[in-house]
């Protein structure tokens, strides 16, 4: 009986820090992440909790800097990499020169590899192809079709369908003009 009590006591003591960590609120995990990671450097559960809390915070606040913080903690985090690459792609896409569009296409393509079930990167690839060369119909069309095969929220799906329809109308206009 004494052995069981001792084993139970040892088990309780060794589990106590984990329970204390798990009781931290998400805000504490986000804003005290540096000190928590310093205090518990080998706690992978704590690290994952901090990353999850930061991802949720970044999503709700649309804050790219939080994704960059996550990449410092976990350089291979696919969600943070996806958002960082999409942000880079948006910045390149805003530029008016062709090399900017090629850089945007590259960033969006890389983002698509990190979360391969989302169609949004393919929509933006199509937009970049259209901006790069308004006479290129096949590459944007291929990108829009790929986008529609994957997950899109309703608003983005409507945007893709509208862009695809405008592209097809423009393609028909050019084709009819050159008959």
Feature map (PLM): residue ranges:
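Terminal, low-structured helical/coil segments at or just beyond the last alpha-helical repeat
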Residues: 141-179
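Sec-dependent N-terminal signal peptides
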Residues: 3-13
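A conserved position within tetratricopeptide repeats
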Residues: 33-44, 58, 71, 75, ...
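Alpha-solenoid repeat scaffolds
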Residues: 43, 77-78, 95-99, 135-136, ...
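N-terminal leader/linker segments that initiate helical-solenoid repeat arrays
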Residues: 15-61
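TPR alpha-solenoid repeat register
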Residues: 46, 80, 121, 156-160
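Alpha-helical adaptor scaffolds
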Residues: 52-59, 67-68, 72-121, 128-131
């Amino acid at each position: 009986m004494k052995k069981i009590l001792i084993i139970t006591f040892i088990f309780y003591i060794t589990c106590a820090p984990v329970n204390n960590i798990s009781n931290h609120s998400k805000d504490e995990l986000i804003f005290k992440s540096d000190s928590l990671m310093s205090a518990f450097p080998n706690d992978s559960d704590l690290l994952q909790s901090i990353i999850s809390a930061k991802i949720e915070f970044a999503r709700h606040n649309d804050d790219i800097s939080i994704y960059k913080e996550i990449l410092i903690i976990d350089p291979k985090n696919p969600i943070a990499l996806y958002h960082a690459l999409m942000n880079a792609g948006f910045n390149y896409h805003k530029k008016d020169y062709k090399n900017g569009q090629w850089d945007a296409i590259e960033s969006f393509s890389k983002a698509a590899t990190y979360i391969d079930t989302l169609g949004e990167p393919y929509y933006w690839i199509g937009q970049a192809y259209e901006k790069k060369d308004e006479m290129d119909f096949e590459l944007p069309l291929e990108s829009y079709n790929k986008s529609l095969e994957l997950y899109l929220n309703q608003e983005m799906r409507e945007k893709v369908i509208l862009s695809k329809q405008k592209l097809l109308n423009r393609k028909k206009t050019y084709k009819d003009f050159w008959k």
